[in-house]
Amino acid sequence: MKLKSDFLGLLYSRGYFNQCTDLAELDQLMSKECVIAYIGFDCTARSLHIGSLMQIMILRYLQKCGHKPIVLLGNGTTKIGDPSGKDKSRTLLSSSDIQENTLGIRKVLEKFIVCGGGVSDALLVYNAEWLDKLNYIDFLRNIGRHFSVNNMLTFDSVKLRLEREQNLSFLEFNYMLLQAYDFIELNQRYNCLLQIGGSDQWGNIVNGVELGRKLKLPQLFGLTTHLLLTSTGEKMGKTADGAIWLDGEMYSPADYWQYFRNVKDEDVGRFLRLFTELPLTEIEKLENLKGYEINEAKKILATEATRICHGEKIAQDIAYDALKVFECNDHSGLPVFYVCKSEIELGLSVVKLLQVSGMEKSNSSAKRLINDKGCKINDIIILDVNYKLSLQDFCGMSYIKLSCGKKRHLKVVLESDL
């Protein structure tokens, strides 16, 4: 697709773009002038996790392309809870919890974007500023009358709950009105013309665009990104052990690096486009690496993603420590266990390896070790009890280091079949 706007062209070429309310008109506008756009985050936790990382990267690209991002922290809408993608009502948070979460999320966002008074500096705005002051009767007369309940019932966030006979509170039903109203407030206060969100927010975003039209405001635009899924179709952001937080105190930078180092081969190219700022020409070379060489691309992905989130020095230190596993460490003193190459090619489970090598007494104790994050291969934590070793884990070497806790280590040597 040929686009005039650098920003929209970037979203399209790097795989962010999903759909837009009026792409041709928005492209024309963004190619000519600085556009003010907003992305909202509700304050439901003390940090954002990597499920929000795609939106955060878009905030960065808005700035890099000369546009002005508004980050809307939903300390007002959090009091209600967004029903989108939820099977049940959210637990209502106390005012003090929302305040603490708001401060934590702000701290995370300030690592990624430049905030201030410059032309393309981000504005941090809080919707409680206007939502807390709303007069209910006036809101119903001036805003509520523009919404059709018939239409609202067709939105997935409502329809799916009702089809499953799951409770949808009147409180949550109002959420889409408040999100639409946020867009109107941001337009009138800051001349914001564009709202960006995940594809699950399409209905809410369109509501805001339509409300602006009915109120005879300048044309507003909505744009959505693809939902962040892995190659296996799983929603990204959480593992079996919990969320991958962007706050280094809640999820260590080293674990963050390892998370990206451990992604599936099929995800490497896409994640390089989404979560790094490497040129596309370089990414194309990296994603074409085959066999164990793909691990080099994974290391670059992990280091670049960690750099953006936690800073250059921390990322380089973690990458260097990982490199020392083979290139600097001497593993000659470790006990040795031999495995046949054919076993690895067939897929040797880590649980079985722990048991047959004598590192663990039984399969159940091996699984407990993995669930407790005590098992590492080449100092990378194994999180999946069903994980199977492949030749790629050997990174072109003749052995791997298998660790159980901090003190027990084994050198697993690849042996050719006779």
From Swiss-Prot:
Pfam families membership: tRNA-synt_1b
Binding site for ATP: K238
GO function terms (MF aspect): ATP binding; RNA binding; tyrosine-tRNA ligase activity
Biological process according to GO: tyrosyl-tRNA aminoacylation
EC number(s) given by UniProt: 6.1.1.1
Record PANTHER family: TYROSINE--TRNA LIGASE, MITOCHONDRIAL, TYROSYL-TRNA SYNTHETASE
Protein name: Tyrosine--tRNA ligase
Protein's gene: tyrS
